[in-house]
């Protein structure tokens, strides 16, 4: 068996959270799903308050997981583009379910924004 697969949690929900379990990864997934291929700075602008280091780290993690494809063009200055792989595109129903749930939550009387995490 593949050693990477052996390290995944037995629970499929936990496996999914391991792969896209932080807010930055979900926002990267959202933007690449909505926009298609994007350059690093476009992605950074689209997400908003994400540092270059955090974006780089999360893109590498998602690339290693097979969710994001990184293409480097031999140009001066260098150009790098990111897009979703087929596996990344297969997460679109998960994103859509999150969108629907979020919209429904915002319609609830007394809906509260989440507390800021320390």
Where in this protein do the model-derived segments appear?
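HhH-family (HhH-GPD) DNA N-glycosylase catalytic core used in base-excision repair
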Residues: 1-7, 46, 103-118
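A basic, often C-terminal nucleic-acid-binding module that engages the phosphate backbone, implemented
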Residues: 69, 86-87, 92-93, 108-118
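Basic, amphipathic "hinge/linker" alpha-helix immediately C-terminal to the N-terminal HTH DNA-binding motif
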Residues: 74-98
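Alpha-helical linker/hinge and terminal dimerization helices associated
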Residues: 30, 65, 94-108
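Canonical helix-turn-helix DNA-binding module
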Residues: 41-73, 77
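N-terminal helix-turn-helix DNA-binding core of bacterial DNA-binding proteins
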Residues: 7-54, 81
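Short amphipathic alpha-helical/adjacent loop interface patches that line ligand
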Residues: 47, 59, 88-95, 102
């Amino acid at each position: 068996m593949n050693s990477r697969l052996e390290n995944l949690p037995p629970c499929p929900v936990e496996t999914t959270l391991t792969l896209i379990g932080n807010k930055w990864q979900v926002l990267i997934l959202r933007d690449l799903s909505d926009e298609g291929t994007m350059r690093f700075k476009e992605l950074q602008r689209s997400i908003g308050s994400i540092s270059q280091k955090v974006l780089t780290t999360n893109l590498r993690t998602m690339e290693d997981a097979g969710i994001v494809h990184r293409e480097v063009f031999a140009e001066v200055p260098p150009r790098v583009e990111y897009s979703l792989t087929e596996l990344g595109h297969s997460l679109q129903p998960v994103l859509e379910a999150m969108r629907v749930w979020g919209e429904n939550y915002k319609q609830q009387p007394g809906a509260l924004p989440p507390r800021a995490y320390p």
